[in-house]
């Protein structure tokens, strides 16, 4: 069940780090030490079908029946409290999705609910999306609280450029001095209320990966902007973040890739997609699944803004 307390916290629990989280949202099953039982084999077949249905929905390439099946499996998982499914479904509601004749309409309210629940369960990639959603809705207070929460949990802790700096730059000017103090109080209240659960989830995500789980090489990808005279520079002059769902083979190469969300919606993500397609992960020759799924965030950042703290 969706926690009803979030309905009453729209100012604090808003409707909006990155770093080493690419492997944190992986849903690949662990490799068994012995031959699988018939029930385990059937479970793997069902999971592979579910993954294929969800990928069809996210990529927008599939029949209406397949895409609806992908949506229903995401919805069931999200309502059961699966944070990865909540993150994915919330991201899809951000802008809606068309897949064959299946249309998932944009729904800011559902996006905020699912993403907020994913965030408080340690899926920090939900925080930039929630902040961007609140920017779109004209809710500068809420957007800033999500940006501060993102900054608080960012990895490494010293990351004061990129997404949080950009979000704060774009919204702080909309607030009065009193409101600036209020967002700090609200962010602290959010952290105090949910920190134990978030830290526990982050600790679990940091545990040694299983044999089948993709392990990224290095931090998340950042791409320099084009030259200042380019129209793309104007469109994405602050920052762009694209979250991909990627299927890696046993050798660690990308076999399938689909965009979960792009914030802000960048008009030409070709360069970011190339970066994602070239990304390799750890090989797993002994893995009993042909494809290993993972979220991969790719950030475009021109380092235009940096957060400085004045005593």
Regions from the language model: what does each represent?
Residues 63-72, 100-113, 139-146:
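Structural signature of tandem alpha-helical TPR/SEL1-like repeats
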Residues 83-86, 124-126:
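Helix-start (N-cap) detector for alpha-helical repeat units in TPR-like alpha-solenoids
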Residues 53-60, 88-98, 127-136, 165-169:
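Hydrophobic face of amphipathic alpha-helices that form TPR/SEL1-like repeat modules
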Residues 2-16:
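Bacterial N-terminal signal peptides that target proteins for export
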Residues 31, 43, 48, 76, ...:
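Charge-biased low-complexity segments
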Residues 15-24:
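Bacterial N-terminal signal peptides
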Residues 27-68, 72:
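N-terminal leader/linker segments that initiate helical-solenoid repeat arrays
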């Amino acid at each position: 069940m969706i926690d009803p307390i979030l309905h009453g916290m729209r100012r604090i629990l808003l409707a909006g780090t990155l770093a080493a989280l690419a492997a944190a949202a992986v849903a690949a099953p662990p490799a068994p030490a012995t031959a699988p039982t018939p029930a385990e084999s059937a479970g793997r077949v069902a999971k592979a079908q579910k993954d294929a249905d969800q990928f069809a929905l996210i990529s927008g390439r599939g029949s209406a029946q397949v895409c609806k099946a992908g949506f229903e499996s995401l919805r069931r998982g999200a309502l059961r409290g699966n944070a990865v499914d909540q993150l994915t479904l919330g991201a899809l509601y951000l802008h809606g999705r068309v897949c064959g004749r299946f249309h998932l309409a944009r729904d800011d309210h559902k996006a905020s609910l699912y993403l907020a629940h994913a965030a408080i369960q340690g899926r920090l990639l939900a925080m930039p999306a929630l902040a961007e959603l609140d920017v779109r809705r004209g809710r500068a207070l809420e957007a800033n609280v999500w940006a501060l929460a993102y900054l608080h949990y960012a990895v490494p802790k010293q990351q004061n450029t990129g997404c949080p700096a950009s979000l704060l730059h774009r919204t702080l000017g909309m607030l009065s001095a009193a409101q600036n103090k209020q967002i700090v109080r609200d962010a602290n209240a959010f952290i105090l209320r949910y920190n134990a659960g978030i830290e526990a989830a982050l600790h679990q995500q940091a545990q040694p990966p299983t044999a089948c789980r993709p392990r990224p090489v290095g931090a998340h990808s950042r791409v320099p902007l084009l030259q200042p005279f380019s129209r793309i520079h104007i469109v994405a002059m602050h920052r762009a973040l694209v979250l991909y769902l990627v299927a890696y083979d046993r050798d660690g190469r990308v076999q399938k890739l689909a965009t979960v969300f792009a914030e802000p919606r960048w008009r030409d993500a070709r360069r970011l997609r190339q970066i994602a397609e070239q990304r390799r992960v750890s090989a797993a020759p002994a893995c009993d699944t042909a494809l290993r799924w993972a979220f991969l965030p790719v950030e475009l950042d021109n380092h235009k803004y940096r957060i400085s703290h004045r005593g």
